[in-house]
Swiss-Prot record:
GO cellular component terms listed in the entry, alphabetical order: host cell endoplasmic reticulum-Golgi intermediate compartment membrane; host cell plasma membrane; membrane; viral envelope; virion membrane
Gene Ontology terms: biological process: endocytosis involved in viral entry into host cell; fusion of virus membrane with host endosome membrane; fusion of virus membrane with host plasma membrane; receptor-mediated virion attachment to host cell
Protein name: Spike glycoprotein
Organism: Human coronavirus HKU1 (isolate N1)
Region named Heptad repeat 2: 1249-1289
Disulphide linkage map: 20-156, 151-183, 163-242, 282-292, 327-352, 370-423, 382-605, 929-940
PTM summary: Specific enzymatic cleavages in vivo yield mature proteins. The precursor is processed into S1 and S2 by host cell furin or another cellular protease to yield the mature S1 and S2 proteins. Additionally, a second cleavage leads to the release of a fusion peptide after viral attachment to host cell receptor.
Encoding gene, per UniProt annotation: S
Length: 1356
């Protein structure tokens, strides 16, 4: 629980801050509080209290609460004065820390004045800062009652009370409030005014204050409890001033004895009336630890292992890096230029010192609290670095800063990391000096025109919604598209290079053509379809700023009056932000988050509790504080060269510090743990003390922590022995207090050891002796079997076997939306389901517990595996998870851009360009005529309705040819005039082609218009007929309704209908029936859900059992060798390996399994000489060759019986217990006949139908004649059918246009160059020659092996 601390460290605490009076105040010295000679004796319940709401009878319990330490002393904090008050009375040690609480013993001063009894004692005040913004608890005697208040007092600087019996020259003054203070608690309690002592028990826990009281030394009883929600840090006993009190009168002496409380475990004993009669502080002594361990005030004789003992430190070693600069955190926090939450600022402080007390005082702190860290531990601690974030707080959003809040400040501005160790500071600055820096950190907002907010200096901007965009986002539409829009034209502008224009599309809606619709409408916050909006809502993460405000894209384009054509947005286009002032009471409220990195592992240190660097003590146990890391250890100086200049601490693999380099002396040290050992206590019921054995510790180490009186001590083979005489040369054959390794603690009564005490100056009732148990030479005729002889088989030979085992330790998590599972989206079902109470909540709670249990189980399994287990990666198992051969195409389908695509010939697409044109019937005939030869253009002129036509498309070569002909005809007239005829014909025929195409389209349009007009006329006639028919229907229906109304009136009058409306009755019945059916469905589905959850619980129980079994097998089989047979595999365990598997662990066990056995006679025990019994230890007594021998239980190996393999018994008798013969009841309960039971319950139930008669003649039954209207509608349908439009078919023809001549020329040249290069490679290079040589050799005749012939010539 986070407790907000409104105080400075304890060194700054004072009693009040209001100067109520200056009369008779001095600073004369006074004595320190007295220390009591008597101590807290809890043996009869002193210092204990009764547990709330619980009663215990005749029992002993262990209870952990807030108790004083047994044997602790009291301090007397009472102060008594006459006229003067000393300023030293209001400082330490009288002003004390409250911590967990206090137990006080108060003397009740009883005075008789004028035959009136006055009960007087001092007033105690418990609080924190003792001013009117925190609660102070005051316990004050007043006129024979206890007046207890918890109010926001303004305490005086020098508070005091006065005597009521004899009065005082001073006026009582301990608080000053102009008006009635705010109080949480105010109540009077009676107490026994005639008692001598009063006892008070005050403690606090989790923000709640508890008070207990008693008027005797018995346990205190509950007085009251009060939740404050904050810590009380100090307490103080007010001085009591009286007139002329006699100092020699004991009855007039003030005493207020106080001792602190701490959280301790007590053993409490209750009698048959529920009264605490005895108590034991479990950690006060070794004997009390035995009492608590056995829950007995008188433990049995025995040896008890107690909590470990560690040698206590004898010195302190303190180290800090010297001469580090001050962090100056307060200067950064007090900077008057404060950011807003939108652009919060961060600064990192490292390698410096800071004083938290001074810091909190300099920044006008409102509150300071920490998360995942105790704020009180910051004082004196060191950190690797401290990261500070700050921003001004909008007054209306202050609640958003609560940890875990999802308000605007944490969702869209600054996210507080609740998983890290951090502290939250709320402070303020004078508003007159503060200027809020409202800066938008979003780069994409600023790119499109966001400049500033134009707000006042105290207005704090914060984001309500954040939006993220990709790098190609642009909010403006493309200008060319916008110009084509005739309706809903979007604003447009030029977007930056590398960005995409706003997504828009043009459609036809009703009679509006080119109606444009763009994305992100009406704005990104309330977009119709968020998926089509490029602006995505986002939440800020830890350490992140808001990605940007949303932009209304309808307000982005070329701004009015601007010559800039780039995409910009107007000021009001940016959405999702708001602002508020930070000023209250003329101060601006600011929030700062302290993130603590590397706690106790750095050089950024708080110097609040700064201590000077000390000497490094070696070879002794010391407390150390090394650069903020604290602990205990023994330093040994070593020569180490592995420290770099920036390193000074040495760690092991587990993160424990094991060495350090001293920056002061430049020496290096290794750190070893302080000497520690286990403590064994030997206790005998007749003794008043214990014999202690500090195992593996020398007495010289132990004596550093223990003050000896008359106890003897010595070093033994087992360790240091206290309170026993060293008599190891003396042996005993029987021992009740065995210490192990052949040693025993023998108890002697004081009478038997009196002679020995005369010879030794220091002696004890215990002796440390050698233990030699009875060892008999076994004679066959003196030994008898105990319990009979039995024949068993013992293994004599084995073989190694391996076995795989899979154990499930985890399971997939299941979550169910109960309401949706039962009712889907049916509203009526949800309403009825709400009447089932918390069923769904219970289901979700159970599943959450199941999932939490899964997490916990998995964590435990992981912890077990992480501690000393190596997961084998070479197990040859039968579990294969090869997914390479799994074909998912049948599930996924075709993926990629080529799915569903079709194409023409590759060469056609490569060599030609495609053109599509409308064909009314002559284009296809023209192409069939030309056959691809463009020179036949005019020869293939087509005739359409007697008109010469050509297709309106020309290729590049045709255009070139006709242009050349026209040019030649124009250059040399009249001789070349004939050359222009083809051009003229070409133009005229193609114009004819366009004309006939338009003619056909025009005719089609006329046909459509005529047919549509006819259809409208038919529809009109049909609607008229329908209207007439509906009028007739309405007339008949109205008349029937009138008749029905008359019938219902008769029913109401004659039969006394329960409702005036039959429809209402039917609707209610239907609704009731529907609810019944819904209820049945809900019951069925809830039953199914309950069965499923029950199955989940059953399954998780199996998983939990499997996880527990897996952890047990990891610990017993993998980490060690199990003694259990068939637990780790099949047989006697050798070793096991473990491997991760899906939802579990896979074990490979190796064991040896017996394959041959020997049958022997065994006995459960042997009786020696008729009175001493022995039993085998981890084996059997076997009769081998008429001799009794011992053999192990897992392997036949006879050996002599000795004290190492037997257990001794005091008797030879055997106690038998007969097993009860109890069987499970498997009988099926017998039920009575169903029909007879039904008749028993319903034998008198009879339903009689009422005699109902109706006057049907009063109903007006009218028949409708709609023959004429039906014929008229039929004629309209026929007319619509005749409106079929036989439009002229206009085909679409696809033609190919050849490339120009120069393209073919370029292709030819490229082909020729390729052939030349190929020829050069094949014929003019060595590669080509080698190829020809190969081909030549292929044709040679092969006739077998040919020897090489070498021809040589020489002179004889």
């Amino acid at each position: 629980m986070l407790l907000i601390i409104f105080i400075l460290p304890t060194t700054l605490a004072v009693i009040g801050d209001f100067n109520c009076t200056n009369f008779a105040i001095n600073d004369l010295n006074t004595t320190v509080p007295r220390i009591s000679e008597y101590v807290v004796d809890v043996s009869y319940g002193l210092g204990t209290y009764y547990i709330l709401d619980r009663v215990y009878l005749n029992t002993t319990i262990l209870f952990t609460g807030y108790f004083p330490k047994s044997g602790a002393n009291f301090r007397d904090l009472s102060l008594k004065g006459t006229t003067y008050l000393s300023t030293l009375w209001y400082q330490k040690p009288f002003l004390s820390d409250f911590n967990n609480g206090i137990f006080s013993r108060v003397k009740n001063t009883k005075l008789y004045v004028n035959k009136t009894l006055y009960s007087e004692f001092s007033t105690i005040v418990i609080g924190s800062v003792f001013i009117n913004n925190s609660y102070t608890i005051v316990v004050q005697p007043h006129n024979g009652v206890l007046e207890i208040t918890a109010c926001q007092y303004t305490m005086c600087e020098y508070p005091h009370t006065i005597c009521k019996s004899k009065g005082s020259s001073r006026n009582e003054s301990w608080h000053f409030d102009k008006s009635e203070p705010l109080c949480l608690f105010k109540k009077n309690f009676t107490y026994n005014v005639s008692t001598d002592w009063l006892y008070f028990h005050f403690y606090q826990e989790r923000g709640t204050f508890y008070a207990y009281y008693a008027d005797s030394g018995m346990p205190t009883t509950f007085l009251f409890s009060l939740y404050l929600g904050t810590l009380l840090s100090h307490y103080y006993v007010l001085p009591l001033t009286c007139n002329a009190i006699s100092s020699n009168t004991d009855n007039e002496t003030l005493q207020y004895w106080v001792t602190p409380l701490s959280k301790r475990q007590y053993l409490l004993k209750f009698d048959n009336r529920g009264v605490i009669t005895n108590a034991v502080d479990c950690s006060s002594s070794f004997f009390s630890e035995i009492q608590c361990k056995t829950k007995s005030l008188l433990p049995n004789t025995g040896v008890y292992d107690l909590s470990g003992f560690t040698v206590k430190p004898v010195a302190t070693v303190h180290r800090r890096i010297p001469d580090l600069p001050d962090c100056d955190i307060d200067k950064w926090l007090n900077n008057f230029n404060v950011p807003s939450p939108l652009n919060w600022e961060r600064k990192i402080f490292s390698n410096c010192n800071f004083n938290l007390s001074t810091l909190l005082r300099l920044v006008h702190t409102d509150s300071f609290s920490c998360n995942n860290f105790d704020e009180s531990k910051i004082y004196g601690s060191c950190f690797k670095s401290i990261v500070l974030d700050k921003f001004a707080i909008p007054n209306s959003r202050r609640s958003d800063l609560q940890l875990g809040s999802s308000g605007f400040l944490q969702s869209s501005n600054y996210k507080i990391d609740t998983t890290s160790s951090s502290c939250q500071l709320y402070y303020s600055l004078p508003a007159i000096n503060v200027t809020i820096n409202n800066y938008n950190p979003s780069s994409w907002n600023r790119r499109y025109g966001f400049n500033n907010f134009n707000l006042s200096s105290h207005s704090v901007v914060y984001s309500r919604y954040c939006f993220s965009v990709n790098n190609t986002f642009c909010p403006c539409a493309k200008p060319s598209f916008a110009s084509s829009c005739k309706s809903h034209k979007p604003p447009s502008a030029s977007c930056p290079i590398g960005t995409n224009y706003r997504s828009c599309e043009s459609t036809t809606v009703l009679d509006h053509t080119d109606w444009c619709r763009c994305s992100c409408l009406p704005d990104p916050i309330t977009a119709y379809d968020p998926r089509s909006c490029s602006q995505k809502k986002s939440l800020v993460g830890v350490g992140e700023h808001c990605a940007g405000f949303g932009v209304d894209e309808e307000k982005c384009g070329v701004l009015d009056g601007s010559y800039n054509v780039s995409c910009l947005c107007s000021t009001d286009a940016f959405l999702g932000w708001s602002y508020d002032t930070c000023v209250s009471n003329n101060r601006c409220n600011i929030f700062s988050n302290f993130i603590l990195n590397g706690i106790n592992s750095g050089t950024t240190c708080s110097n609040d509790l700064l201590q000077p660097n000390t000497e490094v003590f070696t070879d002794v146990c010391v407390d150390y504080d090394l650069y903020g890391i604290t602990g205990q250890g023994i330093f040994k100086e070593v020569s180490a060269v592995y420290y770099n200049s920036w390193q000074n601490l040495l760690y092991d693999s587990n993160g424990n510090i094991i060495g350090f380099k001293d920056f002061v002396t430049n020496k290096t040290y290794n750190i070893f743990p302080c000497y520690a050992g286990r403590v064994s206590a030997a206790f005998h019921q007749n003794a008043s003390s214990l014999a202690l054995l500090y195992r593996n510790l020398k007495c010289s180490y132990v004596l550093n922590n223990i003050s000896l009186t008359t106890q003897p001590y010595f070093d033994s083979y087992l360790g240091c022995v206290f309170n026993a005489d060293n008599l190891t040369d003396y042996s005993v054959s029987s021992c009740a207090l065995r210490m192990g390794s052949g040693f025993c603690v023998d108890y002697n009564s004081p009478s038997s050891s009196s002679s020995r005490r005369k010879r030794r100056s220091i002696s004890a009732s215990y002796r440390f002796v050698t233990f030699e148990p009875f060892n008999v030479s076994f004679v066959n005729d003196s030994i008898e079997s105990v319990g009979g002889l039995y024949e068993i088989k013992i293994p004599t030979n084995f073989t190694i076997v391996g076995q795989e085992e899979f154990i499930q330790t985890n399971s997939p998590k299941v979550t169910i939306d109960c309401s949706l599972f039962v009712c889907s989206n049916y509203a009526a079902c949800h309403d009825l389901l709400s009447e089932y109470g918390t069923f769904c909540d219970n289901i979700n709670s159970i599943l959450d517990e199941v999932n939490g249990l899964l997490d916990t189980t998995q964590l435990h399994v992981a912890d077990t595996l992480m501690q000393g287990v190596t997961l084998s990666s070479n197990l040859n198992t039968n579990l294969h998870f090869d997914v390479d051969n799994i074909n998912f195409k049948s599930l996924v389908g075709c993926l990629g851009p080529h799915c569903g695509s079709s194409s023409r010939s590759f060469f056609e697409d490569l060599l030609f360009d495609k053109v599509k044109l409308s064909d009314v019937g002559f284009v296809e005939a023209y192409n069939n005529c030309t056959g691809g030869s463009e020179i036949r253009d005019l020869l293939c002129v087509q005739s359409f309705n007697g008109i010469k036509v050509l297709p309106p498309i020309l290729s590049e070569s045709q255009i070139s040819g006709y242009t050349t002909a026209a040019t030649v005809a124009a250059m040399f007239p009249p001789w070349s005039a004939a050359a222009g005829i083809p051009f003229s014909l070409n133009v005229q025929y193609r114009i004819n082609g366009l004309g006939v195409t338009m003619d056909v389209l025009n005719k089609n349009q006329k046909l459509i218009a005529t047919a549509f007009n006819n259809a409208l006329l038919s529809i009109q006639n049909g609607f008229s007929a329908t209207n007439s028919a509906l009028a007739k229907i309405q007339s008949v229906v109205n008349s029937n309704a009138q008749a029905l109304n008359s019938l219902l009136q008769q029913l109401f009058n004659k039969f006394g209908a329960i409702s005036s409306s039959l429809q209402e009755i039917l609707s209610r019945l239907d609704a009731l029936e529907a609810q019944v059916q819904i209820d049945r469905l809900i019951n069925g589905r809830l039953t199914a859900l309950n069965a499923y959850v029950s199955q989940q619980l059953s399954d998780i129980s199996l998983v939990k059992f499997g996880a527990a079994l897996a952890m047990e097998k990891v610990n017993e089989c993998v980490k060690s060798q199990s003694p259990r047979i068939n637990f780790c595999g099949n047989g006697n365990h050798i070793l096991s390996l473990v491997q991760n598997a899906p939802y579990g662990l896979l074990f490979m066990h190796f064991s040896y399994k017996p394959i041959s056995f020997k049958t022997v006679l065994v006995s459960p025990g042997l009786c020696i000489s008729g009175d001493v019994g022995i039993a085998p230890k981890q084996g059997y007594f076997i009769k081998h060759n008429d001799h009794w021998m011992f053999t192990g239980s897992s392997y036949y190996y006879p050996e002599p019986i000795s004290d190492k393999n037997v257990v001794f018994m005091n008797t030879c008798s055997v106690n038998f217990t007969k097993a009860p013969l109890v069987y499970l009841n498997h009988s099926v309960p017998k039920l009575s006949d169903f029909e007879s039971e039904l008749s028993h319950w319903f034998k008198n139930q009879t339903s009689i139908a009422p005699n109902l008669t109706l006057n049907l003649h009063t109903i007006n039954a009218t028949f409708l004649d709609l023959y004429y209207e039906m014929n008229l509608i039929q004629e309209s349908i026929k007319s619509l059918n005749n409106s079929y439009i036989n439009l002229k078919d206009i085909g679409t023809y696809e033609m190919y246009v050849k490339w120009p001549w120069y393209v073919w020329l370029l292709i030819s040249f490229s082909f020729i160059i390729f052939l030349v290069l190929l020829f050069f490679i094949c014929c003019c290079t060595g590669c080509g020659s080698a190829c020809f040589s190969k081909c030549h050799n292929c044709c040679d005749e092969y006739g077998g092996h040919h020897d090489f012939v070498i021809k040589t010539s020489h002179d004889d």
